[in-house]
C-alpha cells in the first residue's frame, strides 16, 4: 500500500496502542519495512502508564511524527471521577521519556463537560499542558534540542452514551460547551509556555447532534431519514453549518 499510494505515515490506531500484545513485534516489522522509505510511524492513544520506552527508542531513528497521550482531564480529582487511573507524576514521566527519546511534538487529548467538572478542572488542562512543555526544556539540553517543543492540546466534548456509567448524566448545551472551550483557551494564554501550546476543540454543534443520536429512541429514525432526504449520506459536513439540516 505504501508503495502504491505514496503515503508518508503509518498510524497504529487503537483505544490504547500500548495494550496490543504484539506491539513490539509489529513495530519491529514496520521499522524494517519503513527505515529506508522515511515513513512516519505514529503511535496515538498511548496509555502513558503502559508506554514502552523500548518501543519508543526503536522508532526514534525513523522520521518522527508526534506522540499522542490521553490524560482526559486536567485535574487528578476529575481523572479519579472517570476512573482514568493516571497521576500527574506518571503523565509527566511519560512525556519526559518521550522527550529523552528525541520527540519534541506531543498531542494531548482531553474532554470537556465531564460530570462534576469545575472551572478549576478546566484550567487544569492549561496547567498540565504548561508543565509538559516545561518538562521538555528541563529535560533536553539546549544543544540537543530539535527546535522548540510543540504541545497540541485538543478537547472533545463529553457525550453521555447508553450502557455506560454516565448514561444518565446531563449533557452540556452548545453554549456551555463553547464557554468551556473559551475558558480553556484563556487559561492556556496565561501560561508561561503558552507559545509552545496550540489549542483546538471539537465542534460543539456536532457534539450536540451526536448526543441526540446516541440517546434517542425510535423516533430519531425519522430525523435520520429526513436528513438523508435532504442530502446527508456519509459526509462529515465539517465545512457547513449543522443548523440548516434541522
What do the PLM-derived regions correspond to, one by one?
Residues 38-40, 150, 194-198:
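A generic structural signal for alpha->beta connector loops
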Residues 155-240:
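Radical SAM enzyme [4Fe-4S]-AdoMet core and its adjacent flexible, acidic
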Residues 146-150, 203-204:
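Short Gly/Ser/Thr- and Asp/Glu-enriched loop/turn motifs at secondary-structure junctions
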Residues 130, 137, 152, 182-186:
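Class I SAM-binding transferase module
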Residues 1-148:
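Conserved SAM/AdoMet-binding glycine-rich loop
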Amino acid at each position: 500500500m505504501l508503495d502504491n499510494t505514496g503515503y508518508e505515515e503509518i498510524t497504529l490506531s487503537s483505544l490504547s496502542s500500548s495494550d496490543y500484545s504484539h506491539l513490539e513485534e509489529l513495530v519491529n516489522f514496520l521499522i524494517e519495512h519503513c527505515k529506508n522509505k522515511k515513513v512516519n510511524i505514529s503511535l496515538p492513544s498511548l496509555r502513558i502508564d503502559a508506554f514502552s520506552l523500548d518501543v519508543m527508542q526503536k522508532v526514534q531513528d525513523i522520521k518522527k511524527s508526534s506522540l499522542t497521550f490521553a490524560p482526559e482531564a486536567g485535574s487528578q480529582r476529575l481523572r479519579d471521577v472517570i476512573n482514568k487511573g493516571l497521576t500527574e507524576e506518571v503523565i509527566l514521566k511519560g512525556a519526559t521519556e518521550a522527550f529523552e527519546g528525541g520527540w519534541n511534538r506531543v498531542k494531548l487529548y482531553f474532554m470537556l463537560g465531564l460530570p462534576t467538572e469545575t472551572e478549576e478542572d478546566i484550567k487544569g488542562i492549561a496547567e498540565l499542558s504548561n508543565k509538559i512543555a516545561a518538562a521538555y526544556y528541563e529535560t533536553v539540553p539546549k544543544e540537543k534540542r530539535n527546535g522548540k517543543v510543540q504541545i497540541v492540546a485538543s478537547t472533545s466534548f463529553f457525550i453521555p452514551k447508553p450502557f455506560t456509567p454516565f448514561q444518565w448524566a446531563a449533557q452540556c448545551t452548545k453554549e456551555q460547551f463553547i464557554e468551556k472551550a473559551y475558558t480553556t483557551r484563556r487559561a492556556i494564554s496565561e501560561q508561561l509556555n503558552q507559545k509552545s501550546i496550540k489549542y483546538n476543540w471539537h465542534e460543539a454543534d456536532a457534539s450536540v447532534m451526536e448526543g441526540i443520536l446516541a440517546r434517542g429512541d425510535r423516533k430519531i429514525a425519522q430525523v435520520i431519514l429526513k436528513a438523508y432526504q435532504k442530502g446527508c449520506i456519509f459526509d462529515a459536513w465539517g465545512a457547513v453549518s449543522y443548523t440548516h439540516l434541522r
